């Protein structure tokens, strides 16, 4: 049972209160997305043909999602529940990573990086949605920090994709 933690938003104009169940739902949604992102970046790192440094960048992004997972799990547990197990397996990738379905080894690095960028697009959308909720201050701070990291990485992945596409031309 979720520990009853009713939390008032810091926004003086927002009169709504988000209960612990709702907060945990938001955090679990981000947790599933982080697990999917980790799996997606690992798959991309395994599929790219380019330099070792590109593989290392993609694996570093997977590690970033792993760290986000750990932070989200810890926050969920402060509500007295265990986090969802969804997305924990290394199985199928979610819709945002669909371009990797099938034989990713037949794809160019630019195509693989485009799949990474689409995955980051999905992560940005999930974080924006979460930040639109009336989250407790400590949860909002965590979500905001993670969101900013996803935005930075999205820009980096886009730059890598653009460079890989230019090399193909």
What are these regions (language model features)?
Residues 11, 17, 55-56, 83-100, ...:
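Charge-rich, acidic-biased intrinsically disordered regions
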Residues 53-91, 157-160, 164:
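Conserved alpha-helical segments that form or flank metal/cofactor-binding pockets of metalloenzymes
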Residues 112, 116-169:
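Preference for long, well-ordered alpha-helical segments
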Residues 21-30, 51-71, 109-115, 138-150:
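Alpha-helical scaffold segments that form or flank carboxylate-/histidine-based iron centers
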Residues 16-50, 110-134:
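Alpha-helical bundle segments that constitute or directly flank the non-heme di-iron/ferroxidase center
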Residues 2-12, 70, 74-124:
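Carboxylate-rich helix-loop segments that flank metal/cofactor sites and access channels
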Residues 39-46, 70-77, 81, 98, ...:
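Charged/polar positions within long, soluble alpha-helices
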């Amino acid at each position: 049972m979720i520990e009853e933690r009713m939390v008032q938003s810091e926004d003086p104009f927002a009169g709504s209160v988000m209960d612990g169940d709702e907060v945990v739902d938001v955090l679990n949604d981000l947790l599933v997305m982080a697990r999917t992102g980790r799996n997606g970046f690992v798959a991309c790192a395994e599929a790219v043909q380019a330099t070792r440094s590109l593989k290392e960048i993609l694996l570093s992004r997977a590690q970033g999602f792993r760290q986000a997972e750990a932070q989200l799990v810890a926050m969920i547990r402060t509500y007295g529940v265990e986090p969802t197990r969804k997305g924990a397996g290394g199985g199928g990738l979610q819709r945002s990573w669909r371009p990797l379905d099938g034989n990713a080894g037949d794809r160019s690095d630019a195509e693989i990086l485009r799949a990474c960028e689409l995955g980051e697009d999905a992560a940005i959308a999930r974080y924006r949605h979460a930040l639109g909720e009336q989250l407790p201050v400590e949860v909002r701070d965590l979500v905001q920090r993670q969101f900013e990291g996803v935005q930075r990485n999205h820009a980096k992945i886009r730059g890598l994709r653009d460079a890989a596409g230019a090399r193909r031309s």
